[in-house]
């Protein structure tokens, strides 16, 4: 199991958990009252459960030459979206950043 903190405008908003490469969970912090991660992931008390890597996070990953460079330099498997997100998570476009919990 791997975990990451999800920040919105620098405030911890949620936790992303990879149970295995086919099972993911996104839990908002119980006292979080700020903006949602995205329109498709509004703030709620119950966790979101996914049977694949969450689309929002897949959508912020690099593509093309940038992806190939990331995979090569960080020695990441192309199918390991969680590791890709951890590699670029603090430098995403927009208000969301992601940092691995070690």
Residue ranges and their predicted role:
Residues 1-102:
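Phosphate/dinucleotide-binding and metal-coordinating scaffold of catalytic cores
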């Amino acid at each position: 199991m791997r975990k990451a903190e999800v920040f919105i405008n620098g405030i911890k908003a949620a936790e992303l958990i990879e149970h295995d490469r086919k099972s993911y969970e996104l839990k908002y912090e119980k006292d979080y009252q700020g903006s949602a991660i995205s329109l498709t992931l509004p703030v709620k008390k119950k966790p979101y459960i996914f049977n694949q890597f969450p689309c929002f996070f897949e959508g912020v990953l690099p593509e093309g030459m940038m992806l190939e460079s990331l995979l090569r330099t960080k020695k990441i498997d192309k199918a390991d979206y969680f590791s890709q997100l951890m590699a670029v998570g603090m430098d995403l476009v927009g208000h969301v950043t992601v940092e691995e919990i070690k």
